């Protein structure tokens, strides 16, 4: 922050501060940049995370990048790409955990199926745990989260490419707006749901999942930071509800809903998908109801109340966006089966459709609970006069 700069984020400037600098003779000399601490982390131990000290001996120089007081704007040019990268990395870790737990479930015999009388036949061979419904539920959850997360990352890449290759300013603006709308979700859903997914992968292994003999425990430690760095879940949620939803009088939200409606129309061409497209349509109406409930708080300047449950809104909104992606995937897969498209195997397309069903039947219903929390007039999380957290 340059002396005399405005208070708050508007007074932040961007500087390059090298470890070494050139002196007047052109030789390199130390720039008084030191490593103060090496943090001992829970996970992500493949690289160092350090605390740097600048100018401990009052002999450190930095070079201004761009204009004074524009640092935060410059940083966000990098930040959007970094947030997409976090979503991509979270998807990758969750994917590795899914396939590790899937392999284990296909190899580990444990327990027996119940007979029609509700008892186990001890003479029968033990079943592989992948045959047990509860284990299959945990595996399906992982598959739904992992592939749903990857679809978000690919959607962001698609919008970025369409913006970059747009033939008109109007088209460029459209895809930039759509990209801006989904970036908080692309960062947050793979991080939060991915952590939950890896947790289920670890659970598939039982006690072994907790031991270093298997890699699931490392995946769990490694993915946990994803909901923290490059903007915590709370910050992403406030960005979504406080800025993205309201920007340009809701233009971005209207564009996004328009894209979702296109998928619903495509899915409605397949009677097999009607119940799922109807479910997504209902969630869009529910989103409108939520915003109609919240907006009066923003309009009268009560932003604390408006944003109090932003993280819950993020969970709701993420389910809608990922559900949209899954419906698109299922519609394309069903059409490929009907067209006898041989690009991928029959089971590949079938697995996409069945995973979509899991998402809509097990994950999407959570959106209703989230909506009830958000629209509840109670303000239990807002601090009152007396502190009750004792």
Predicted regions and their residues:
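C-terminal amphipathic alpha-helical interaction region
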Residues: 247, 263-390
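Short beta-alpha connecting loops at secondary-structure transitions
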Residues: 37, 75-83, 124-125, 133-138, ...
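A short core secondary-structure module
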Residues: 1-30
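Alpha-helix capping/hinge segments and adjacent helical runs
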Residues: 44, 155, 177-255, 358-384
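Gly/Pro-rich turn-and-neighbor structural signature
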Residues: 132-203
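Alpha-helical support elements that line or immediately flank enzyme active sites
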Residues: 87-100
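Short, glycine/acidic-rich hinge or "gate" loops at secondary-structure transitions
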Residues: 106-121, 154-171, 202-213, 336-344
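A glycine-rich, basic-preceded beta-loop-alpha segment at the flavin cofactor/substrate interface
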Residues: 22-36, 41, 48-82, 102-130, ...
């Amino acid at each position: 922050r340059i002396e005399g700069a405005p208070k708050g984020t508007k007074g932040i400037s961007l500087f390059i501060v090298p470890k070494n600098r050139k002196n007047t003779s052109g030789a390199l000399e130390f720039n008084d940049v030191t490593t103060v601490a090496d943090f001992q982390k829970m996970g992500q131990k493949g690289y160092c995370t350090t605390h740097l000290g600048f100018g401990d001996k009052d002999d450190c120089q930095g070079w201004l990048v761009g204009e004074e007081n524009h640092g935060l704007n410059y940083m966000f040019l990098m930040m959007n790409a970094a947030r997409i990268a976090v979503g991509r990395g979270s998807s990758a870790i969750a994917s590795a955990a899914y396939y590790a737990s899937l392999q284990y479930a296909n190899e580990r015999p444990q327990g027996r199926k119940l007979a029609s009388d509700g008892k186990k036949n001890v003479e029968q061979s033990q079943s592989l745990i992948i045959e047990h419904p509860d284990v299959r539920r945990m595996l399906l959850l992982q598959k739904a989260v992992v592939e749903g997360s990857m679809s978000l990352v690919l959607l962001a890449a698609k919008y970025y490419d369409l913006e970059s290759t747009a033939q008109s300013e109007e088209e460029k603006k459209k895809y930039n707006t759509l990209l801006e709308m989904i970036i908080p979700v692309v960062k947050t859903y793979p991080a939060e749901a991915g952590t939950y997914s890896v947790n289920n992968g670890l659970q598939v292994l039982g006690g072994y999942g907790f031991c270093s003999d298997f890699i699931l425990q490392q995946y769990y430690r490694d993915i946990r930071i994803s909901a923290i760095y490059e903007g915590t879940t709370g910050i992403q949620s406030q960005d979504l509800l406080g800025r993205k939803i309201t920007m340009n009088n809701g233009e971005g939200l209207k564009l996004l809903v328009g894209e979702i409606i296109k998928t619903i129309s495509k899915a409605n061409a397949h009677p097999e998908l009607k119940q799922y497209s109807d479910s997504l349509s209902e969630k869009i109406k529910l989103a409108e109801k939520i915003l109609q409930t919240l907006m009066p708080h923003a309009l009268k300047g009560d932003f604390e109340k408006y944003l109090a449950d932003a993280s819950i809104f993020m969970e709701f909104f993420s389910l809608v966006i990922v559900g949209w992606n899954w419906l698109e995937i299922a519609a394309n897969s069903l059409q490929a089966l009907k067209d006898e498209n041989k690009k991928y195997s029959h089971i590949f397309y079938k697995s996409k459709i069945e995973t979509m069903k899991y998402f809509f039947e097990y994950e999407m219903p959570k959106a209703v609970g989230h909506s009830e929390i958000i629209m509840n007039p109670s303000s239990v999380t807002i601090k009152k006069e007396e502190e009750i957290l004792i």
